[in-house]
Swiss-Prot record:
PROSITE patterns associated with the record: RIBOSOMAL_S3AE (PS01191)
Taxonomic source organism: Debaryomyces hansenii (strain ATCC 36239 / CBS 767 / BCRC 21394 / JCM 1990 / NBRC 0083 / IGC 2968) (Yeast)
Gene: RPS1A
Assembly mode: Component of the small ribosomal subunit. Mature ribosomes consist of a small (40S) and a large (60S) subunit. The 40S subunit contains about 33 different proteins and 1 molecule of RNA (18S). The 60S subunit contains about 49 different proteins and 3 molecules of RNA (25S, 5.8S and 5S).
Name recorded for this polypeptide: Small ribosomal subunit protein eS1A
Keyword Lyase appears in the UniProt entry: no
Biological processes, Gene Ontology terms: translation
Stored InterPro entries: Ribosomal_eS1, Ribosomal_eS1_CS, Ribosomal_eS1_euk
Pfam families: Ribosomal_S3Ae
Protein backbone atom coordinates (compact mmCIF):
# COMPACT_ATOMS: atom_id res chain seq x y z
CA UNK A 1 0.00 0.00 0.00
CA UNK A 2 1.41 3.31 -0.98
CA UNK A 3 2.06 5.64 1.90
CA UNK A 4 1.64 9.33 1.23
CA UNK A 5 -0.63 12.31 1.24
CA UNK A 6 -4.15 11.76 0.04
CA UNK A 7 -4.74 14.74 -2.26
CA UNK A 8 -8.47 14.24 -2.33
CA UNK A 9 -8.81 14.45 1.45
CA UNK A 10 -6.54 17.49 1.79
CA UNK A 11 -8.50 19.62 -0.65
CA UNK A 12 -10.71 22.27 0.88
CA UNK A 13 -14.30 22.95 0.06
CA UNK A 14 -14.96 24.42 -3.33
CA UNK A 15 -16.57 27.82 -3.69
CA UNK A 16 -15.20 29.40 -0.52
CA UNK A 17 -15.82 33.13 -0.53
CA UNK A 18 -12.86 35.48 -0.57
CA UNK A 19 -12.47 37.95 2.24
CA UNK A 20 -14.29 41.14 1.28
CA UNK A 21 -12.18 44.27 1.81
CA UNK A 22 -13.93 47.61 2.05
CA UNK A 23 -12.42 49.81 -0.72
CA UNK A 24 -13.00 52.96 1.36
CA UNK A 25 -10.35 51.87 3.88
CA UNK A 26 -7.71 52.72 1.26
CA UNK A 27 -9.13 56.19 0.63
CA UNK A 28 -9.05 59.51 2.47
CA UNK A 29 -11.43 62.47 2.45
CA UNK A 30 -10.58 66.10 1.62
CA UNK A 31 -12.62 69.28 2.16
CA UNK A 32 -13.24 71.46 -0.93
CA UNK A 33 -13.01 75.22 -0.30
CA UNK A 34 -14.54 77.77 -2.68
CA UNK A 35 -12.97 81.24 -3.24
CA UNK A 36 -13.97 84.07 -0.90
CA UNK A 37 -16.06 85.69 -3.68
CA UNK A 38 -18.86 83.25 -2.74
CA UNK A 39 -20.94 83.38 0.45
CA UNK A 40 -20.44 79.74 1.49
CA UNK A 41 -16.88 78.51 1.14
CA UNK A 42 -17.51 74.92 2.27
CA UNK A 43 -18.41 73.18 -1.00
CA UNK A 44 -18.28 69.56 0.10
CA UNK A 45 -15.89 66.62 0.30
CA UNK A 46 -14.05 64.44 -2.19
CA UNK A 47 -12.01 61.26 -1.77
CA UNK A 48 -8.90 59.74 -3.30
CA UNK A 49 -6.59 56.79 -2.68
CA UNK A 50 -4.12 57.32 0.15
CA UNK A 51 -0.51 58.26 -0.57
CA UNK A 52 1.56 55.09 -1.00
CA UNK A 53 5.24 54.94 -1.85
CA UNK A 54 6.09 57.40 -4.61
CA UNK A 55 2.42 58.00 -5.44
CA UNK A 56 1.22 61.19 -3.73
CA UNK A 57 -2.51 61.78 -3.26
CA UNK A 58 -2.10 65.54 -3.78
CA UNK A 59 -0.92 65.00 -7.37
CA UNK A 60 -4.18 63.25 -8.22
CA UNK A 61 -6.29 66.01 -6.66
CA UNK A 62 -4.70 69.00 -8.42
CA UNK A 63 -6.62 69.88 -11.55
CA UNK A 64 -9.79 68.08 -10.44
CA UNK A 65 -12.93 70.01 -11.50
CA UNK A 66 -16.09 69.93 -9.38
CA UNK A 67 -19.54 71.24 -10.34
CA UNK A 68 -21.61 73.01 -7.69
CA UNK A 69 -25.01 74.69 -7.76
CA UNK A 70 -24.67 78.46 -7.31
CA UNK A 71 -27.62 78.40 -4.89
CA UNK A 72 -25.54 76.30 -2.47
CA UNK A 73 -22.59 78.69 -2.73
CA UNK A 74 -24.73 81.81 -2.24
CA UNK A 75 -27.29 80.38 0.18
CA UNK A 76 -30.20 81.58 -1.97
CA UNK A 77 -32.65 79.64 -4.15
CA UNK A 78 -32.71 82.54 -6.62
CA UNK A 79 -29.50 81.12 -8.16
CA UNK A 80 -30.71 77.51 -8.40
CA UNK A 81 -30.64 77.57 -12.21
CA UNK A 82 -26.89 78.14 -12.47
CA UNK A 83 -23.98 75.72 -12.12
CA UNK A 84 -20.44 76.77 -11.21
CA UNK A 85 -17.30 74.79 -12.00
CA UNK A 86 -14.41 75.02 -9.53
CA UNK A 87 -10.90 73.71 -10.23
CA UNK A 88 -8.57 72.42 -7.47
CA UNK A 89 -5.28 74.36 -7.68
CA UNK A 90 -3.63 73.71 -4.30
CA UNK A 91 -3.74 71.13 -1.50
CA UNK A 92 -3.15 72.37 2.06
CA UNK A 93 -3.44 69.59 4.60
CA UNK A 94 -6.99 68.27 4.24
CA UNK A 95 -8.25 71.41 2.45
CA UNK A 96 -8.45 71.82 -1.33
CA UNK A 97 -8.19 75.44 -2.51
CA UNK A 98 -10.17 75.98 -5.71
CA UNK A 99 -10.47 78.67 -8.36
CA UNK A 100 -13.26 79.65 -10.78
CA UNK A 101 -13.33 77.38 -13.85
CA UNK A 102 -16.66 78.25 -15.52
CA UNK A 103 -20.38 78.82 -15.14
CA UNK A 104 -23.40 77.48 -17.01
CA UNK A 105 -27.20 77.34 -16.99
CA UNK A 106 -29.10 74.19 -16.08
CA UNK A 107 -30.77 72.50 -19.04
CA UNK A 108 -34.32 72.96 -17.75
CA UNK A 109 -33.83 76.71 -17.26
CA UNK A 110 -32.38 77.15 -20.74
CA UNK A 111 -35.25 75.22 -22.34
CA UNK A 112 -37.85 77.25 -20.44
CA UNK A 113 -36.54 80.53 -21.91
CA UNK A 114 -37.09 79.51 -25.55
CA UNK A 115 -40.70 80.26 -26.57
CA UNK A 116 -42.80 80.94 -29.65
CA UNK A 117 -43.48 84.35 -31.22
CA UNK A 118 -40.12 85.90 -30.30
CA UNK A 119 -36.63 86.16 -31.77
CA UNK A 120 -33.55 84.68 -30.13
CA UNK A 121 -30.27 86.63 -30.08
CA UNK A 122 -27.03 84.80 -29.24
CA UNK A 123 -23.50 86.17 -29.11
CA UNK A 124 -20.13 84.84 -27.99
CA UNK A 125 -16.68 86.35 -27.73
CA UNK A 126 -13.20 85.30 -26.58
CA UNK A 127 -11.70 87.80 -24.13
CA UNK A 128 -8.59 88.00 -21.95
CA UNK A 129 -8.98 89.35 -18.41
CA UNK A 130 -6.55 91.80 -16.83
CA UNK A 131 -4.83 88.89 -15.00
CA UNK A 132 -4.30 86.94 -18.28
CA UNK A 133 -7.15 84.40 -18.13
CA UNK A 134 -8.58 83.67 -21.59
CA UNK A 135 -12.35 83.12 -21.44
CA UNK A 136 -15.12 82.50 -23.94
CA UNK A 137 -18.34 84.29 -22.95
CA UNK A 138 -21.76 83.25 -24.30
CA UNK A 139 -24.73 85.63 -24.01
CA UNK A 140 -28.40 85.06 -24.78
CA UNK A 141 -31.38 87.44 -25.15
CA UNK A 142 -34.96 87.46 -26.47
CA UNK A 143 -37.14 90.14 -28.01
CA UNK A 144 -40.20 91.32 -26.08
CA UNK A 145 -43.44 93.15 -26.86
CA UNK A 146 -43.39 96.91 -26.95
CA UNK A 147 -45.81 99.05 -24.99
CA UNK A 148 -49.31 99.18 -26.56
CA UNK A 149 -48.35 96.58 -29.17
CA UNK A 150 -51.29 94.90 -30.91
CA UNK A 151 -49.39 92.36 -33.00
CA UNK A 152 -48.99 88.95 -31.39
CA UNK A 153 -45.44 88.21 -32.55
CA UNK A 154 -42.24 90.06 -31.63
CA UNK A 155 -39.99 88.89 -34.45
CA UNK A 156 -37.09 91.23 -35.28
CA UNK A 157 -35.44 92.10 -38.58
CA UNK A 158 -32.04 90.55 -39.34
CA UNK A 159 -30.40 93.98 -39.49
CA UNK A 160 -31.68 94.80 -35.99
CA UNK A 161 -30.45 91.47 -34.65
CA UNK A 162 -26.98 92.13 -36.10
CA UNK A 163 -26.89 95.53 -34.37
CA UNK A 164 -27.91 93.98 -31.05
CA UNK A 165 -25.35 91.19 -31.41
CA UNK A 166 -22.60 93.71 -32.17
CA UNK A 167 -23.56 95.74 -29.10
CA UNK A 168 -23.57 92.62 -26.90
CA UNK A 169 -20.05 91.69 -28.03
CA UNK A 170 -18.76 95.24 -27.37
CA UNK A 171 -20.18 95.28 -23.84
CA UNK A 172 -18.83 91.81 -23.00
CA UNK A 173 -15.35 92.74 -24.25
CA UNK A 174 -15.35 95.98 -22.26
CA UNK A 175 -16.67 94.48 -19.02
CA UNK A 176 -14.38 91.43 -19.02
CA UNK A 177 -11.10 92.89 -20.27
CA UNK A 178 -11.01 95.59 -17.57
CA UNK A 179 -11.35 93.25 -14.57
CA UNK A 180 -9.66 90.26 -12.96
CA UNK A 181 -11.18 86.78 -12.81
CA UNK A 182 -12.33 87.33 -9.21
CA UNK A 183 -13.98 90.65 -10.15
CA UNK A 184 -15.67 88.98 -13.13
CA UNK A 185 -17.08 86.30 -10.82
CA UNK A 186 -18.57 89.05 -8.64
CA UNK A 187 -20.21 90.53 -11.77
CA UNK A 188 -21.62 87.22 -13.00
CA UNK A 189 -23.47 86.38 -9.78
CA UNK A 190 -25.81 89.46 -9.77
CA UNK A 191 -26.08 89.55 -13.62
CA UNK A 192 -24.39 92.96 -13.96
CA UNK A 193 -23.40 92.42 -17.61
CA UNK A 194 -26.94 91.37 -18.59
CA UNK A 195 -28.43 94.56 -17.15
CA UNK A 196 -25.80 96.64 -18.96
CA UNK A 197 -26.74 94.98 -22.27
CA UNK A 198 -30.43 95.68 -21.62
CA UNK A 199 -29.77 99.40 -21.05
CA UNK A 200 -27.54 99.78 -24.11
CA UNK A 201 -29.90 98.02 -26.55
CA UNK A 202 -33.14 99.81 -25.60
CA UNK A 203 -32.80 102.20 -28.54
CA UNK A 204 -32.37 99.29 -30.99
CA UNK A 205 -34.76 96.60 -29.72
CA UNK A 206 -36.62 95.96 -26.48
CA UNK A 207 -35.10 92.78 -24.99
CA UNK A 208 -35.95 90.43 -22.13
CA UNK A 209 -34.32 87.45 -20.38
CA UNK A 210 -30.80 88.71 -21.06
CA UNK A 211 -28.23 86.42 -19.46
CA UNK A 212 -24.60 85.42 -19.64
CA UNK A 213 -25.49 81.85 -20.51
CA UNK A 214 -22.05 80.29 -20.20
CA UNK A 215 -18.45 81.15 -19.34
CA UNK A 216 -15.75 78.74 -20.48
CA UNK A 217 -12.09 78.90 -19.40
CA UNK A 218 -9.79 78.39 -22.39
CA UNK A 219 -6.36 79.30 -21.03
CA UNK A 220 -4.93 80.27 -17.65
CA UNK A 221 -1.66 81.96 -16.68
CA UNK A 222 1.20 80.34 -14.78
CA UNK A 223 0.11 79.19 -11.33
CA UNK A 224 0.75 81.74 -8.56
CA UNK A 225 0.25 80.48 -5.00
CA UNK A 226 0.23 83.99 -3.52
CA UNK A 227 -2.69 85.17 -5.66
CA UNK A 228 -4.64 81.96 -4.90
CA UNK A 229 -4.17 82.42 -1.15
CA UNK A 230 -5.23 86.07 -1.47
CA UNK A 231 -8.35 84.89 -3.33
CA UNK A 232 -9.15 82.62 -0.38
CA UNK A 233 -8.36 85.38 2.13
CA UNK A 234 -5.40 83.57 3.65
CA UNK A 235 -2.65 86.06 2.77
CA UNK A 236 0.75 85.28 1.34
CA UNK A 237 2.97 82.43 2.45
CA UNK A 238 6.21 84.30 1.74
CA UNK A 239 8.44 84.66 4.79
CA UNK A 240 9.95 88.11 5.13
CA UNK A 241 12.95 88.84 7.33
CA UNK A 242 13.32 91.83 9.63
CA UNK A 243 15.51 94.74 8.68
CA UNK A 244 18.79 94.80 10.62
CA UNK A 245 19.98 98.12 12.01
CA UNK A 246 23.16 99.57 10.50
CA UNK A 247 25.05 99.59 13.81
CA UNK A 248 24.60 95.89 14.50
CA UNK A 249 27.77 93.90 15.19
CA UNK A 250 28.27 90.22 15.89
CA UNK A 251 29.16 89.43 19.50
CA UNK A 252 32.57 87.73 19.71
CA UNK A 253 33.05 85.40 22.66
CA UNK A 254 36.51 85.63 24.27
CA UNK A 255 36.20 82.29 26.04
CA UNK A 256 34.31 79.19 25.09
Amino acid sequence: MAVGKNKRLSKGKKGLKKKVIDPFTKKEWFDIKAPSTFENRAVGKTLINRSTGLKNAADGLKGRVVEVCLADLQGSEDHSSRKVKLRVDEVQGKNLLTNFHGIDFTTDKLRSLVRKWQSLVEANVTVKTSDDYVLRIFAIAFTKRQANQIRKTTYAQSSKLREVRKKMIEIMQREVSNCTLAQLTSKLIPEVIGREIEKSTQTILPLQNIHIRKVKLLKQPKFDLGSLLALHGEGSTEEKGKKVSAGFKDVVLETV
